[in-house]
Amino acid sequence: MTMKKALLGAALLLSPLLAMAGNWPVTVKDMDNRTVTVTQEPQRIILQDGRDILTLAVLERDNPFAKVVAWNNLPKKQDTETWNVLKRKWPEADKILDMKFSDQGNVDLETVISRHPDLMIAQLRAKPSLVQSGVLAKLEALHVPVVFVDYELHPVENTMPSIAMLGKVLGQSDRAQDYINFYQQRLDTIHQRLAKVEKKPLVF
């Protein structure tokens, strides 16, 4: 099972909890080791990689799309099974601006800015293109905080810290920790089972 499938499964299976109030401003270190301050609770979020909606589904379980104003709808393009699950549960997802934000930085930035975003969540792998295209500089000039998460370049080291960071930014640290515990328990179970498997000699 991929990490993104695990996130979706957890979002749908974990029992709903009361959201804990966050305190803003909050300052975090993102997965690019940048210090980012978010001055208020994000209400208008851009997703550079639409698959990160699965993380929001863990943190904002009632409706992960409620605060998303623009995204690159990769689930629709690349994973129709996941997209159909998301669309059935949250039909409004199909109405959110699909900005077709590629890793090459291609995007109609003016249209995105017209949505008045107050946070962009981006994958670390896309940073070079965001810098080269000027997207990062433009958003920073408009005082729109950008945080980089990473589930692909260094998944072992950065996946859980990415979720913890977003939990803090979104005022959902308890839910982030809830998922991290859920993930760690299952990872420990796998390790325990593997430790009991007898090593067999290699046959050439």
Give, region by region, the residue ranges found by the protein language model.
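Bacterial N-terminal signal peptides that target proteins for export
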Residues: 1-10
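N-terminal ligand-binding lobe of clamshell/alpha-beta domains
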Residues: 20-204
